[in-house]
């Protein structure tokens, strides 16, 4: 089976696509996956680093661009559809999965017109504009939150969760080693780390009596690292401060409480590794979807949510203290998070995709082609 994964822009779209691709290629040596995205998106660097080929099209978003910006970006669509058609003709995928982001629109629509089975994977509680539009033509809509189902026809919805990359999953499932002092993990994700960094430093004076009894790992991003380190030192704390955490699975395994944003991929990781959390949704997220994402964990008893407009150092310190000082509450929150986890999401989504392929092509392996056959890239593909 050959799968094409279209879309990207941010890690929240790209990483679930990579997780699905990893599941597909490990199932059978003849399976392969190709991605389609844009040169400006995170996928342009992350996908090749993960070992998958990627094709690039030229397309820009319409939402939030203003009238003139939207009209200018609309002019790119005919070219994007032509590029998508060329890519689909060359790669001959058996199924195309859109993972959100504006790059997925032309590819999935062109695949639908070519009678190739199509699906979308929606990571958030509120479906993005592109996925909402594509939902009218695709065969399946894979969702992670019950709230997202309302954007798609009921017969198309498969609520299976967000896929998590295989290497991370293997580490999450390792038994934890025993430890003593409570451990706190803080990170802001790819967007919106600054405000969270500032409020954590403001919280430290209110946690001064815990500085000898708490271990902190804090991912700051490049902009704030020096300021955050100085803030910790001024209050007598000795944390592990990093610009970027390379191995998030180890960071999760080594903590008792997480303070973070409420992106869909982050929440999928928190639930699979069963970690209590204090969630501060990114207020600029499209359609305020991070608040809706966070609410699903809060309602289940797995997390506490503080909206950024209400976030102060004192409020954050109080929530951290209340949870770290209550081992039984942490355990209840951990169990609640685990009940929301979807460790089999990638496998189950791949199962449905293979069934779509079987229905269309008469075999779960798709169209007849030479084993391992991949098209050569023409020099004018992006032109």
UniProtKB/Swiss-Prot annotation:
Belongs to the glycosyltransferase 28 family. MurG subfamily. Its EC number is 2.4.1.227. It is found in: Cell inner membrane. The keyword Glycosyltransferase applies. Pfam families: Glyco_tran_28_C, Glyco_transf_28. Pathway: Cell wall biogenesis; peptidoglycan biosynthesis. Cell wall formation. Catalyzes the transfer of a GlcNAc subunit on undecaprenyl-pyrophosphoryl-MurNAc-pentapeptide (lipid intermediate I) to form undecaprenyl-pyrophosphoryl-MurNAc-(pentapeptide)GlcNAc (lipid intermediate II). It is an enzyme of class 2 (transferase). It comes from Anaeromyxobacter dehalogenans (strain 2CP-C). SUPFAM superfamilies: UDP-Glycosyltransferase/glycogen phosphorylase (SSF53756). Transmembrane segments: none annotated. One of its GO terms (biological process) is cell division. InterPro entries: GlcNAc_MurG, Glyco_trans_28_C, GlycoTrans_28_N. Keywords: Cell cycle, Cell division, Cell inner membrane, Cell membrane, Cell shape, Cell wall biogenesis/degradation, Glycosyltransferase, Membrane, Peptidoglycan synthesis, Transferase. It catalyses: di-trans,octa-cis-undecaprenyl diphospho-N-acetyl-alpha-D-muramoyl-L-alanyl-D-glutamyl-meso-2,6-diaminopimeloyl-D-alanyl-D-alanine + UDP-N-acetyl-alpha-D-glucosamine = di-trans,octa-cis-undecaprenyl diphospho-[N-acetyl-alpha-D-glucosaminyl-(1->4)]-N-acetyl-alpha-D-muramoyl-L-alanyl-D-glutamyl-meso-2,6-diaminopimeloyl-D-alanyl-D-alanine + UDP + H(+). This is UDP-N-acetylglucosamine--N-acetylmuramyl-(pentapeptide) pyrophosphoryl-undecaprenol N-acetylglucosamine transferase. It is a peripheral membrane protein. One of its GO terms (cellular component) is plasma membrane. GO terms for molecular function: UDP-N-acetyl-D-glucosamine:N-acetylmuramoyl-L-alanyl-D-glutamyl-meso-2,6-diaminopimelyl-D-alanyl-D-alanine-diphosphoundecaprenol 4-beta-N-acetylglucosaminlytransferase activity; undecaprenyldiphospho-muramoylpentapeptide beta-N-acetylglucosaminyltransferase activity. The keyword Cell division applies.
